Amino acid sequence: MATSRYEPVAEIGVGAYGTVYKARDPHSGHFVALKSVRVPNGGGAGGGLPISTVREVALLRRLEAFEHPNVVRLMDVCATARTDRETKVTLVFEHVDQDLRTYLDKAPPPGLPVETIKDLMRQFLRGLDFLHANCIVHRDLKPENILVTSGGTVKLADFGLARIYSYQMALTPVVVTLWYRAPEVLLQSTYATPVDMWSVGCIFAEMFRRKPLFCGNSEADQLGKIFDLIGLPPEDDWPRDVSLPRGAFSPRGPRPVQSVVPEMEESGAQLLLEMLTFNPHKRISAFRALQHSYLHKAEGNPE
């Protein structure tokens, strides 16, 4: 099916994954988001899409069968405009008008009510637990790709795209923010699903602060800002396979969470620290975070 079926309405934005367009499906009247990517053709006599891209798209289509409420829907996939070297693949997603960044900016002072934050976090974690249960690491969670519908439903977007888009991203000189990146990513160590839980912690704090928690301007600067809060981790937790040694950072102890998020109650601070745990093997999972008492008790009630 061709993308010409959809009527372009507006350019939504340009990011690491290329240009995103809002379009209308004239058959249903629904709005969709079109994300196009250039993929280098595979080798072999027939050329065509590389098998890795075919597998990634097949996985996204398989997830779609579950219709998880907290994951943005993939409506269609179109391959068009083939040349000898590359194919344009267009992913057609459901369109949601605002992301979490816009949602937070629109909240009147003093910000979101705590119960709203807890509701958003429960939905966020349910969507992420679903992705992790299906062996998908998002790798780029940030407020801009967490969508919030007008009815308050959270939907995760841009998951499963990192490998599909690796070629496009090499062609697109967009600065990717470091602010939500886990220490193991900043150190260029091996990583898996725990990287997403670090990002969740950064976003959790931002829901209260209404500004990012760690704003570094390089990998080393970002790590320094992280250690200013959680303290310099012990030698045993420092990954072995990295070029940046622990000794590059001055010793420092942890600071109380309330020094950066004063509005957060103690059990919320405990949950945040379990997300912002340096060692990924000790970091809380999305499944376990969903069971945490903080997300199941009313504000101000005892444990």
UniProtKB/Swiss-Prot annotation:
- Which superkingdom does the taxonomy of this entry point to? Eukaryota
- Region Required for binding D-type cyclins, as annotated, extends over 50-56
InterPro entries assigned: CDK (IPR050108), Kinase-like_dom_sf (IPR011009), Prot_kinase_dom (IPR000719), Protein_kinase_ATP_BS (IPR017441), Ser/Thr_kinase_AS (IPR008271)
Q: How is its activity regulated?
A: Both phosphorylation at Thr-172 and binding of a D-type cyclin are necessary for enzymatic activity. Full activation of the cyclin-D-CDK4 complex appears to require other factors such as recruitment of the substrate via a substrate recruitment motif, and/or formation of the CDKN1B ternary complex. Inhibited by INK4 family members. In resting cells, the non-tyrosine-phosphorylated form of CDKN1B prevents phosphorylation at Thr-172 and inactivation, while, in proliferating cells, tyrosine phosphorylation of CDKN1B allows phosphorylation of Thr-172 of CDK4 and subsequent activation.
Task: List where in the cell it is found.
Answer: Cytoplasm; Nucleus; Nucleus membrane
Q: Which residues form a coiled coil?
A: none
- The EC number on file is 2.7.11.22
* Biological processes, Gene Ontology terms: cell division; cellular response to interleukin-4; cellular response to ionomycin; cellular response to lipopolysaccharide; cellular response to phorbol 13-acetate 12-myristate; G1/S transition of mitotic cell cycle; positive regulation of fibroblast proliferation; positive regulation of G2/M transition of mitotic cell cycle
- Disulphide linkage map: none
- Broad class of the protein's primary localization: cytoplasm
- The segment(s) forming the Protein kinase domain are 6-295
Cell division found in the keyword field: yes
Which reaction(s) does its UniProt entry say it catalyses? L-seryl-[protein] + ATP = O-phospho-L-seryl-[protein] + ADP + H(+); L-threonyl-[protein] + ATP = O-phospho-L-threonyl-[protein] + ADP + H(+)
One GO location term (cellular component): chromatin
Which residues does the annotation say bind ATP?
12-20, 35
Q: Which residues participate directly in catalysis?
A: 140
Which Gene Ontology molecular function entries are recorded, alphabetically? ATP binding; cyclin binding; cyclin-dependent protein serine/threonine kinase activity; protein serine kinase activity
UniProt keyword terms in alphabetical order: Acetylation, ATP-binding, Cell cycle, Cell division, Cytoplasm, Kinase, Membrane, Nucleotide-binding, Nucleus, Phosphoprotein, Proto-oncogene, Serine/threonine-protein kinase, Transferase
Q: Which EC main class describes this enzyme? A: transferase
> What post-translational changes are documented for it?
Phosphorylation at Thr-172 is required for enzymatic activity. Phosphorylated, in vitro, at this site by CCNH-CDK7, but, in vivo, appears to be phosphorylated by a proline-directed kinase. In the cyclin D-CDK4-CDKN1B complex, this phosphorylation and consequent CDK4 enzyme activity, is dependent on the tyrosine phosphorylation state of CDKN1B. Thus, in proliferating cells, CDK4 within the complex is phosphorylated on Thr-172 in the T-loop. In resting cells, phosphorylation on Thr-172 is prevented by the non-tyrosine-phosphorylated form of CDKN1B.
How is this protein organized at the quaternary level? Answer: Component of the D-CDK4 complex, composed of CDK4 and some D-type G1 cyclin (CCND1, CCND2 or CCND3). Interacts directly in the complex with CCND1, CCND2 or CCND3. Interacts with SEI1 and ZNF655. Forms a ternary complex, cyclin D-CDK4-CDKN1B, involved in modulating CDK4 enzymatic activity. Interacts directly with CDKN1B (phosphorylated on 'Tyr-88' and 'Tyr-89'); the interaction allows assembly of the cyclin D-CDK4 complex, Thr-172 phosphorylation, nuclear translocation and enhances the cyclin D-CDK4 complex activity.
* Reported function: Ser/Thr-kinase component of cyclin D-CDK4 (DC) complexes that phosphorylate and inhibit members of the retinoblastoma (RB) protein family including RB1 and regulate the cell-cycle during G(1)/S transition. Phosphorylation of RB1 allows dissociation of the transcription factor E2F from the RB/E2F complexes and the subsequent transcription of E2F target genes which are responsible for the progression through the G(1) phase. Hypophosphorylates RB1 in early G(1) phase. Cyclin D-CDK4 complexes are major integrators of various mitogenenic and antimitogenic signals.
Q: Which family, according to the similarity comment?
A: Belongs to the protein kinase superfamily. CMGC Ser/Thr protein kinase family. CDC2/CDKX subfamily.
- Which protein is depicted? Cyclin-dependent kinase 4
Q: Which organism is it from?
A: Sus scrofa (Pig)
Taxonomic lineage:
Eukaryota, Metazoa, Chordata, Craniata, Vertebrata
